[in-house]
């Protein structure tokens, strides 16, 4: 059995998706619709940059979704590979929106619009430079939670991403993260400050939660037979009525990616297909379980060799 997985931020590069755009009218139509939906040329930004503009969260989120959605539809329509046979659809952070759109719960234009709003809300939730994220390597969730508890009167930080065995990301205020990094260093735990301008997936995103609550409540989610795994619970979403609440909770809560992958494997998934730019999730899955099959779809050659 296979699962389809969709990447989040950090996978974007200028020029991504160009091969698909050049080869398939279907993709040209999707890019044109995206430009019209967003009232600016996201196509030009994706293909020409500049990189610093593509890296702005408000642009990155709809851009990565557009690439993932385009590739997904090329696989289905141009190569007649039925990805709806997937046991689960799942995505990392913004990738969860790619998953629910490709799985049939939210239409293309609504997903673009909500991700543009989400990107702006998350970027503006904390003044620039006042929050950030730190990656911790070679430790465990239990160890990090113990350190956070022991130092709760000294600094505040939250686990934002539980990505894989030995890769955890924390969010917090810049000053608190400096203190955290010193404590981690004292404990011989390797850590790296990430080049992001906001502390995603923690309580500092509260203003973004308010905006997204209002915006998500305006949307109509459809029904689908396809099963989704939630970032918030790492479990199957049993009822599509829970989608909005889980997407709202996702903004301030940790992305339980490691647990999500383990849960899918425990439910007989032995093949993961990553659809979108880069191969970040493929690397994480490999760290979690070396036995499973992984396909990363970045070009048409990858699709031609895909077997499900």
Feature-to-residue mapping (PLM):
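Short alpha-helix immediately C-terminal to the canonical SAM-binding loop
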Residues: 177, 282, 303-304
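Short, flexible loop segments at boundaries between secondary-structure elements
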Residues: 233, 293-308
């Amino acid at each position: 059995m296979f699962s389809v997985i969709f990447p989040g931020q950090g996978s974007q590069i200028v020029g991504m998706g160009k091969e698909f755009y050049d080869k398939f009218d279907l993709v040209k139509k999707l890019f044109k619709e995206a430009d019209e939906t967003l009232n600016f040329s996201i196509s030009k930004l994706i293909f020409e940059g500049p990189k610093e503009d593509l890296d702005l969260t408000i642009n990155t989120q709809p851009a990565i979704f557009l690439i993932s959605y385009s590739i997904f539809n090329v696989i289905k329509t141009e190569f007649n590979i039925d990805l709806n046979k997937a046991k689960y659809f799942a995505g990392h952070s913004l990738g969860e929106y790619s998953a629910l759109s490709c799985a049939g719960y939210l239409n293309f234009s609504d997903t673009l619009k909500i991700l543009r709003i989400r990107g702006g809300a998350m970027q503006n939730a904390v003044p620039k430079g006042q929050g950030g994220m730190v990656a911790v390597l070679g430790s465990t969730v239990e160890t990090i939670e113990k350190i956070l508890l022991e130092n709760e009167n000294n600094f505040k930080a939250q686990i934002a991403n539980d990505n894989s065995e030995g890769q955890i990301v924390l969010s917090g205020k810049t000053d608190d993260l400096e203190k955290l990094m010193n404590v981690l260093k004292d404990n011989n735990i390797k850590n790296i400050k990430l080049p992001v301008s906001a502390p995603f997936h923690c309580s500092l995103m509260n203003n973004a939660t308010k905006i997204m609550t209002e915006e998500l409540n305006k949307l109509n989610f459809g029904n689908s037979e396809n099963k989704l795994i939630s970032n918030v619970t790492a479990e199957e979403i049993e009822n599509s009525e829970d989608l909005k609440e889980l997407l709202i909770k996702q903004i301030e809560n940790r992305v339980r990616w490691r647990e999500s992958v383990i849960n899918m494997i425990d439910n007989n998934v032995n093949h993961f297909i990553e659809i979108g730019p880069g191969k970040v999730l493929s690397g994480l899955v490999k760290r979690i379980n070396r036995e499973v099959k992984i396909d990363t779809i970045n070009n048409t050659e990858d699709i031609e060799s895909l077997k499900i």
